[in-house]
């Protein structure tokens, strides 16, 4: 960030899942020290408000001027703004969301499989990264018969088809997803 600042290059940090992490782990803790840091957040993840298509950003004042030149003040509807404001004021909802997410994620972190590993992420983050030890296994295709939506590792730099990103299921779907993973683990 410091080097980019010396070159007048802004650094943009996407914290779409930022509401799931402890505040001290946010890039926002760095903001007072840098004039080139932009941190973006979304209402679509922890707040569950994907339908309002709204987000927000933290940035130094001087970076708002270029942004004002490429956008307009009505990019977000008035009802969406009211919903977003109410969401920001409801810290209790976020605490409950983080607690429930951790509770639903725990069985996946405590379980061990022969061929599958779960990469370490915060217990409160609602995503899992599964990787099969056999690089020839296409995990996305393996999940297809179970009708479980996953994102192939090929969508991410450094990962292959033997990895998938899985959204942590709610309590009612947990057993079915765990059973599917148990069966997929048998592939080799």
Segments (PLM) and residue ranges:
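Conserved PLP-binding catalytic core of the aspartate aminotransferase-like
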Residues: 102, 113-146, 164, 168-170
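PLP-dependent aminotransferase class I/II
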Residues: 36-113, 118-120
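Short acidic/glycine-enriched loop/turn segments that link adjacent beta-strands
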Residues: 51, 124-125, 158-160
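Short amphipathic alpha-helical segments and helix-helix/interface helices
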Residues: 1-2, 27-31, 64, 85, ...
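Generic non-transmembrane alpha-helical segments
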Residues: 86, 107, 111-115, 138-148, ...
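Conserved PLP-binding active-site segment of the aspartate aminotransferase-like
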Residues: 59, 129-135, 147-188
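Active-site pre-lysine segment of PLP-dependent enzymes
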Residues: 1-11, 15-46
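Residue-level detector of structured alpha->beta connecting loops
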Residues: 8, 35, 116-117, 147
